[in-house]
Amino acid sequence: DVVASSTAHKQQDINHLLDK
């Protein structure tokens, strides 16, 4: 699922930003 993949990637980016 392309949409789910895109959402998961965005969530990873958010998690990385919050991790700092």
From Swiss-Prot:
The ranges of region (Disordered) come to 1-20
Where is this protein found?
Secreted, Extracellular space
Q: What is its main location?
A: secreted
Composition bias, Basic and acidic residues: 10-20
Q: Any idea which GO molecular function terms this record carries? A: oxygen carrier activity
- Sorted alphabetically, which keywords does the UniProt record give? Copper, Oxygen transport, Secreted, Transport
Q: Does the keyword Secreted apply?
A: yes
Q: List the disulfide bonds.
A: none
List the record's Gene Ontology CC terms alphabetically.
Answer: extracellular region
Q: Which residues cross the membrane?
A: none
Q: In which tissues is it expressed?
A: Hemolymph.
* Protein purpose: Hemocyanins are copper-containing oxygen carriers occurring freely dissolved in the hemolymph of many mollusks and arthropods.
In the record, the note on similarity to other proteins reads: Belongs to the tyrosinase family. Hemocyanin subfamily.
Task: Share what the entry says about its subunit structure, partners included.
Answer: Composed of 3 major subunits (IB, II and III) and 1 minor subunit (IA) which form homohexamers and heterohexamers. May also form larger structures.
Q: What is this protein called?
A: Hemocyanin subunit II
Q: Which organism is it from?
A: Panulirus japonicus
